[in-house]
């Protein structure tokens, strides 16, 4: 993995030229922000705090976008984004610190490793073997790319690497799980036979370790949104840009302004749900055609009392990777709860075809098999559907074969002076993360002329 040699602040400053005489200095400026996710709320918060007339249009009946904190039984669970991936030089952590919000070190305890093929719980040696496979494969990525070329998928690289290592049987199965699930289908949320080998594991990584927002991301989102002019249940369907204004059609209304900032996910832009007049440039539409959205889903299961011991790693005997991880979040959620994660091939297979009851039953069957016991009926359950959500189109962006970070950079470019874009997919070094969404909102607020950010916690950004 490449690590940045520049502080995140310097990187952001290089990407966001400041213009103290720009639109933010004009009292007639009115910015319409499309989307009340972290990117949109960050931009709106910074603009509003700088005195810029700003309105946010949100399609859903809630704010937060792909952050969504809800309760399952007596437990509070993040059903979308759930971690701060690194807290050093992270604007999300800086904002939390400035707002008096807290976060805790992720202390997930993996106590159960179950291999369905051998019908056995595995011990420390198996964990070590998977760690070694992960480190070995990622360490050999450059050589694999040279050997296999630009059209190779991670699955191609995995097969070559396992063959080169002479692995077979259980050793090959453990290595496959580490590469397919840890590296790809839970990290990038996409099928291992679609993610391009060329750019996998090339993003910059913030230091400081993974942390979990205390009480969930909901408190962070509420702090961003406080006092903002937000219209819920306003899905945007059309954006028209003229020489001196913008018109945005939403929920049968026409909202006018001087600038519009579009922060919807790649999945929404690709769907054509929003029409643009004039049409988006060929550069942007071609970039969108190469990018895609991953599919990471969660099934949250709560009980009145915990019956398990720690978190579970489940190695499916099938290639689809059904329910590979269950996190015990009881300590941070305020009640006994397991959250199962699944992505990539399995998520695509079941989303839109299985009912919620079937998804829950499948998760309980995995737990029963792994723990070799009857599982009590949960007191409450909740199943996510990011894959089929029309306002998301998936979980977050990934790079299939043929896509590159240049496509993410193309998404970040304005179309003229009045149509701007933000979102996790517009930050090529950190895409797929909440901090990327916040970075992009800050970038566009600066582009609109906010020189000095006064929002508590973000003054240095």
Where are the regions a protein language model picked out?
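Intrinsically disordered, low-complexity regions
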Residues: 8-9, 458
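C-terminal motif of bacterial Sec signal peptides marking the signal peptidase cleavage site
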Residues: 11-13
């Amino acid at each position: 993995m490449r690590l940045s040699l520049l502080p995140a602040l310097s990187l952001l400053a290089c990407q966001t030229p400041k213009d103290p005489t720009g639109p933010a200095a004009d009292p007639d400026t009115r910015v319409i922000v499309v989307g009340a996710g972290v990117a949109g709320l960050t931009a709106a918060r910074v603009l509003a705090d700088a005195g810029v007339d700003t309105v946010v249009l949100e399609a859903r009946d809630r704010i937060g976008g792909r952050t969504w904190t809800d309760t399952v039984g007596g437990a509070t669970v993040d059903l979308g984004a759930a971690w701060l991936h690194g807290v050093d030089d992270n604007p999300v952590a800086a904002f939390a610190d400035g707002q008096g919000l807290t976060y805790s070190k992720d202390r997930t305890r993996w106590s159960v490793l179950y291999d369905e093929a051998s019908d056995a719980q595995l011990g420390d040696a198996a964990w070590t073997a998977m760690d070694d496979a992960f480190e070995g494969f990622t360490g050999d990525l450059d050589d694999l790319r040279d050997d296999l070329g630009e059209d190779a998928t991670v699955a191609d690289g995995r097969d070559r690497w396992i063959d080169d290592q002479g692995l077979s049987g259980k050793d090959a199965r453990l290595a496959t799980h580490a590469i397919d699930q840890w590296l790809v289908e839970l990290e990038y949320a996409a099928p291992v036979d679609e993610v391009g080998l060329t750019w996998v594991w090339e993003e910059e990584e913030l230091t400081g370790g993974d942390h979990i927002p205390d009480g969930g991301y909901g408190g962070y989102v509420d702090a961003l949104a406080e006092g903002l002019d937000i219209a819920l249940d306003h899905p945007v369907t059309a954006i028209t840009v003229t020489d001196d204004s913008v018109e945005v059609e939403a929920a049968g209304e026409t909202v006018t302004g001087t600038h519009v900032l579009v922060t919807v996910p790649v999945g929404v832009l690709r769907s054509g749900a929003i029409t643009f007049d004039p049409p988006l440039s060929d550069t942007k539409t071609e970039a969108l055609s190469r990018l895609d959205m991953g599919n990471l889903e969660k099934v949250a299961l709560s009980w009145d009392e915990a019956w398990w011991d720690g978190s579970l790693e489940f190695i499916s005997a099938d290639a689809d990777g059904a329910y590979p991880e269950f996190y015990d979040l009881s300590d941070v959620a305020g009640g006994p709860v397991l959250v199962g994660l699944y992505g990539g091939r399995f998520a695509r297979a079941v989303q839109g075809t299985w009912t919620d009851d079937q998804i829950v039953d499948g998760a309980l069957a995995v737990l029963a098999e792994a723990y070799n016991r009857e599982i009590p009926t949960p007191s409450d359950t909740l199943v996510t559907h990011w894959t089929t959500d029309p306002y998301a189109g998936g979980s977050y962006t990934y790079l299939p074969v043929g896509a590159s970070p240049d496509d993410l950079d193309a998404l970040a470019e304005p179309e003229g002076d009045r149509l701007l874009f933000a979102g996790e997919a517009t930050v090529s070094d950190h895409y797929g993360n909440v901090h990327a969404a916040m970075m992009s909102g800050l970038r566009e607020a600066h582009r609109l002329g906010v020189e000095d950010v006064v929002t508590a916690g973000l003054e240095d950004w």
